[in-house]
Each structure stands twice: as structure tokens, then as C-alpha cells.
Amino acid sequence: VATIGTVLHAGEESFTIKKGKIRGVESYGMLCSEIEIGVGTDNSGIILLDADSITPGTPAASHYGVSSDYVLEVDITPNRVDATSHYGVARDLAAYLTQQTGAEVRAQLPELTASPEAGSCPLPVSVEVPSALCPRFQGLVIRGLKVGESPKWLRQALERIGLKPINVVVDVTNFVLHEYGQPLHAYDLSKVGAGLRVKLAEEQKMTLLDKSEGQLSGQDLVIASADGTPLCVAGVMGGLDSGTTEQTTEIFLEAANFNASSVRKTARRLGLNTDSSFRFERGLDPERTTWALLRAASLILELCPGSSIDGGLFDHYPEPSEPYAVTLDLEYMHRLIGQEIPESDVARILASLEIEVTERQGKLWSLAVPRYRVDVTRPSDVVEEILRIYGYNRIELSGYIHANLSPKGAV
């Protein structure tokens, strides 16, 4: 029972329990469903408890083992795709804390336990489009699965960010997407056939995971079976017929990088805006796929005892990406800002942002900017990043105002 004064949340809406009357009888609370108290997704009716397993008066949080938690809503600007994950936000916060405290602070990634064998992947995969459309395509096969409900910690982690748990495989891919920012997809091997093809679609219809029917065009990138049947709209949404279910015993787990413009056009034409397309449309770093793939595989192996990776890792990566090369002139930076920032601070800020100083020639610094920072490709972008971490509040305001005035009477 939610008593008077309790604040309940249903999706993005919240309401406070107040004293009221129902059919002339005073009400001092409300019986709740799972979704209303945040312990599940069932909203069909009130929760029925076993009277023999619980003592009246026990707090619901204690009975369900719900610990205190906080959900932070972060408003990410469109150019900061690197921050569209928990790790991305933590990495940026670490750079700020390094500058503020003077001690090196680093965002840490979990240890990976999955280790594919040396050799080839047992599932044939062919990439039939230019590297510009699909810069990288990786995947591995996992067999011996018993797909069921995810453990409580994983279900709660997804529910707290507004996602509905599906099954352990799908939940892991969604978890890693939000943890690391790299979309993943799992195909039921029994529905794939003799292999996978990354290709442009034919003029055909496809039933998607949300049960909607999309009309594909020859400009849409898809992952198809060996006979050409589309299984997934690349970077947007998987197909209903190839997804994992409780009957799935083996999967092909995919982590890929798709062209931002291609994904954007396809998603818009199909009227879809998914967590996957949201990230691909803004440009992802192909170097990030391996960690995400092995992280998801590690979790699946941990949560599905008896499962194992079969064979090696498939990796189509014909043109490996390089860091952005930027030359920073410190004198230019000081003129642009209107104040000198100590070189020691500049070096520390760049290091905290994982921007490598590859060479110094006096005031000219050669930089290697990580590919995941798609918004930092020019000297002015680097200056903006340095100033953002250094602190705008530390820049003194000039007492002078510079303006160009037109002569009297000029138009």
C-alpha cells in the first residue's frame, strides 16, 4: 500500500498519494502494481503477495530488495555522441575532476572475460557494400544458450532508465548500448540460414521488431540471410523473425559501424527513431566495436551458464580509422581566449580528454584526437574543449568593448 504523501512514478509522470473518498469511503492509500512502485513492468493489476512469506508492515523496498538509487537526466548536445553512454559521461566528468582536484581521475571500464578462439568464425559473413557504407562489421557465435529472464540487477538497471526487460540476451545488448554507447544486435542462428550478407536492400517489405511493416528501398543497408531475406535494417532495428526468444540456443552477436548519413536517411524514411539510430546518425568510432562486442559476450557467458563462444571473431575492417590530426598554436589559443592558460594546465586537460600531444615545436603542438570525438577536428574545437574543462569562470572579462560603427547616415 502506498500511504498518504508517497510519490509514485509511472513512466515520466509522477503523482502524490492524497487522502480521498472512493464510493463514499475515505481512502488513506492506494494498492499498487509493479510498474507504479518500480519493481517490474506489469501494469495489469495490483500486486498479490503470499501472506505466509511476508509480515504485514514490511516496507516494500525491504521485501523487494530495492536499494537507494539515483537517475540523472543529462541533456546531451547533438554534437556530443561520445557522451551518449554512462561511460562517456563518466569519462567527461573525470576530465573535469582531474582539473578541479589536481589528481588524475580516470573512468574505468569493467574487465572483459570473453576470449574468442584464434581462427575464423563458423558462420560465413560477406560484406557486399563499400567501406564508406559499412566501415566495420564484427561478430561472433555463442552456442549452448538457455535464454530466459535476466537477473534482478539487470532488469532493474534497464527499468530505471525506462527500458522494458525482454530476455537475457536482448537485455545484455541494451545494457551495453547504454553503458558504452555502441549498438549491438543478436541473431538467432536457427533463423539465419547458411550465412549473413551485409548488402543494399531490394524493393521489399520487412516486419520489424516493433511489429511494424517497413517498405525497404534499394538505398537501405540491411543485414540479410544467405538467400537475401532481410534480417535487420542496419543501424536502425532488427527484424521480428530473426530475434532471440526463449527457444533460442545459439546466436550470432554483432557489433558494427554503419555510415551516419545512410542510417539517418533510412530511419527518417521508415519513421523510426531508435536508441541505435540515434547514435549511428551522429557518427560512431569503428574502433569501439570490439570492446562492446566482448563486453556483451562476457555478460552473456556469465548469465547463461553452459554457453560458450564457438570459433573466432569475424572482423571486416578494410580501412582502419586514424585519430584526427590537429595542430594547436598556443599563441592563437591565447589570442582567441584573451588570456594565457599555463602550459601545464593545457597539457593536463588534453591528457584527461585522451587527446595525445604527439610533438611540440615551441608553441605549436601536434595533437592526435580520438576518433570518437567527431566534434573535435579543428584548432578552434580544441580550444573550446580546453576552455570548457579549464572553466569559463576563470577567464577575466575585458574592460574594453570593441565595435565597428558605421558612419552617420550610412545604410
Q: What kind of region is each of these model predictions?
A:
Residues 1-411:
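RNA/tRNA-interacting regions in translation and RNA-turnover enzymes
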